């Protein structure tokens, strides 16, 4: 092949590569697939935050079929980080306290929040099942002790151990971080998935687990 032919071929390859990159970059669109938060969640680099509530039916559905598989596909680039929304549900505050304690227990034990042995996972699905499947309401806000007991029994933790753990600095720090949940949740409700604390995924635009994982990867690389 002549030098001219080689040069032409090389230019064609470069153009094809450039078009491929351009196509990939335009696969997702700000305003359609995601938005940039005006008020980013601090200290959230390399994370996939899920804002959720025990009282949210769609949070339950996503946790059963979407959150785990998606998180598994992107675990090499972002760490799954749940944020419980205290302002939703009669026992939002108590749920946040139970979840914060159990998440920190799992982390200390080196247990994934998706593992069958995760105390957080056990309590979370116990609340989901009780609230959404069994329609349990724990006296509509009048019996917080009964609500807390549901989660602790599922996790295998005593009330005394829970109360002691709740005072730990790491748990209080988690609860403080979760206060950012409200500003995110009021945009499109929950569940709300946020990448790197900056990019809120529009759940209505999610087409599949693979597409969601691709979007997360793209946003995480920004």
Swiss-Prot record:
Keywords: Disulfide bond, Periplasm, Redox-active center, Signal
Keyword Transcription regulation applies: no
Single Gene Ontology MF annotation: protein-disulfide reductase activity
Annotated disulfide bonds: 56-59
Ranges that cross the membrane: none
UniProt-listed CDD domains: DsbA_DsbA
Domain Thioredoxin: 28-221
GO cellular component: periplasmic space
Induction: Expressed from a tri-cistronic operon that encodes AssT, DsbI and DsbL.
Cell location: Periplasm
Effect of residue 56 to S: Loss of activity
Main location: periplasm
Signal peptide start and end residues: 1-27
Subunit: Interacts with DsbI.
Function: Involved in disulfide-bond formation. Acts by transferring its disulfide bond to other proteins. Part of a redox system composed of DsbI and DsbL that mediates formation of an essential disulfide bond in AssT.
Name the UniProt record assigns to this protein: Thiol:disulfide interchange protein DsbL
Organism: Escherichia coli O6:H1 (strain CFT073 / ATCC 700928 / UPEC)
